[in-house]
């Protein structure tokens, strides 16, 4: 709900408009988000330093604003403490301990630490010096709580009061307020690949199977003739370092996808010379516009899988996986780029 990737949905606005449209000016009782009895569980193999940051946002039964909040910060001279100005949207029940410093480095090296039950989250690291406003993004561990605060605030602003009284729960007298239509699956896949939205990947994994994702994926691969040996899947988004997929599996899947999925899948892949994610990998005239590929990265790991058009006009599927390297990650990316260039020029 209210994903930045689908701004036309405007869920909170629609709720407020529907309430006003029914002539409601007072809610006797409370607003309840029914999330079920099974809370989302963080995969045990996810790095602890990732779970409170935006790319560690879990898929929940109710999801709001990409399950992401923004810490708006202000920095001063290098070496001085940065100020936390605001948290948008509000994260009820959570306090932030800010230990972020201003730095000469022009990069976001601030991190949020803390689990889903933590009452206090720690912000450490650095942000660029002398910024009047700098955003650090975190993962909502309880998106329904953030939604409730926001919708109650918006209703109050519109003149609708919520009494917050305890009322007897039940299905009697329920009346449909509004219906929201999901974006198309191909559009969700588009942003999953183009923007590396881990939350969307986890949601798609849940759609495949809430409990047996890895098993179903292997069965489907075998069904379409792709060997699933050597595959270890601990999540759907790739945040777990315990995942393992052979390069051959990715490449075989790309060959199948080109024949079976059509243009929608191809359009979802970042394009060389256009999309920022593959900028380094396509930084050569023979590669610009001729590489479409999905990137993957974590500490000591760089991955690239997609399609390359060579000088002969042939389209080749490829996968490059570099694990546990030492040194400059940009240098590793440049080596991968040069490898692609050599193939493209043959």
Predicted regions and their residues:
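Conserved serine DD-peptidase/penicillin-binding transpeptidase domain
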Residues: 1-228, 345-346
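Small-residue-rich helix-loop
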Residues: 160, 165, 195-198, 202-346
């Amino acid at each position: 709900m209210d994903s930045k990737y689908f701004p036309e949905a405007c869920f909170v606005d629609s709720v407020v408009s529907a309430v006003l449209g029914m002539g409601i000016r007072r809610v006797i009782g409370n607003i309840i988000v029914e999330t079920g009895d099974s809370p989302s569980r963080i995969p045990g193999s996810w790095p602890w330093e990732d779970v409170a940051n935006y790319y560690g946002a879990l898929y929940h039964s109710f999801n709001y604003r990409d399950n992401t909040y923004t810490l708006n910060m202000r920095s001063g001279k290098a070496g001085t403490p940065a100020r936390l100005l605001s948290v948008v949207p509000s994260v009820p029940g959570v306090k932030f301990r800010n230990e972020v410093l201003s730095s000469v480095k022009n990069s976001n090296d601030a991190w949020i630490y803390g689990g889903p039950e933590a009452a206090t989250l720690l912000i450490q690291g650095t942000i660029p010096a002398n910024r009047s406003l700098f955003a650090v993004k975190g993962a909502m561990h309880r998106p329904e709580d953030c939604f409730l605060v926001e919708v109650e605030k918006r209703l109050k602003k519109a003149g609708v009061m919520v009494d917050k009284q305890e009322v007897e729960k039940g299905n009697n007298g329920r009346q449909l307020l509004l219906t929201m239509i999901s974006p198309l699956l191909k559009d969700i896949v588009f942003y999953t690949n183009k923007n590396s939205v881990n939350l969307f990947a986890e949601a798609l994994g849940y759609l495949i199977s809430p409990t047996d994702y890895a098993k179903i994926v292997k069965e489907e691969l075998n069904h379409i003739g792709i060997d699933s040996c050597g595959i270890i899947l601990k999540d759907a988004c790739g945040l777990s370092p315990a995942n393992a997929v052979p390069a051959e599996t990715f490449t075989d899947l790309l060959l199948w996808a080109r024949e079976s999925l059509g243009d929608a899948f191809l359009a979802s892949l970042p394009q060389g010379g256009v999309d920022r994610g593959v900028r380094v990998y396509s930084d050569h005239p023979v590669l610009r516009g001729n590489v479409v590929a999905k990137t993957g990265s974590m500490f000591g790991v760089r991955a690239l899988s997609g399609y390359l058009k060579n000088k002969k006009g042939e389209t080749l599927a490829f996968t490059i996986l570099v694990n546990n390297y030492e040194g400059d990650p940009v240098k590793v990316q440049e080596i991968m780029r040069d490898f692609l260039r050599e193939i493209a020029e043959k």
